[in-house]
A protein has these predicted regions:
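Catalytic core of pol beta-like nucleotidyltransferases
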Residues: 1-38, 46-52, 62-110
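Short, well-ordered beta-strand segments
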Residues: 40, 57-59
Length: 110
């Protein structure tokens, strides 16, 4: 398990490749600790359009447990050093959001 210090979420912008590498390096923890079956980056980071204030948008396939989702969000924010929005893939998703994920999404864990 990683140990983290407090983060200033608006000072640690990284490249798409850096975000991918950080997540890939924690694949075992994400699978075992959170039950993540797959994880995709989407949004501005996946399109290389992020700015200093951008968050990282992540779509995961995992069990619908609110507690795990909150823990996953906090884990990813500390790992990536920025604000993270986590959405869970499910069959009743907003079709516009699903379209964006399918269009721009980059599988980091598959």
């Amino acid at each position: 398990m990683l140990c983290f210090k407090e983060i200033d979420y608006f000072c640690n912008m990284k490249t798409k490749s850096e975000y991918i590498e950080l997540i890939e390096n924690q694949e075992d923890e994400l699978r075992r600790g959170f039950g993540v079956r797959s994880l995709r980056l989407f949004g501005s980071v996946s399109r290389d359009e992020q700015t200093e204030g951008s968050d990282v948008d992540v779509c995961v396939e995992m069990e619908p447990q609110a507690y795990l989702m909150v823990r996953l969000k906090r884990f990813l924010e500390r790992l990536l050093g920025c604000s993270v929005d986590v959405v869970r893939m499910h069959k009743h998703m907003n079709p516009y959001l699903l379209q964006e994920i399918n269009r721009d999404g980059i599988y980091v864990i598959k």
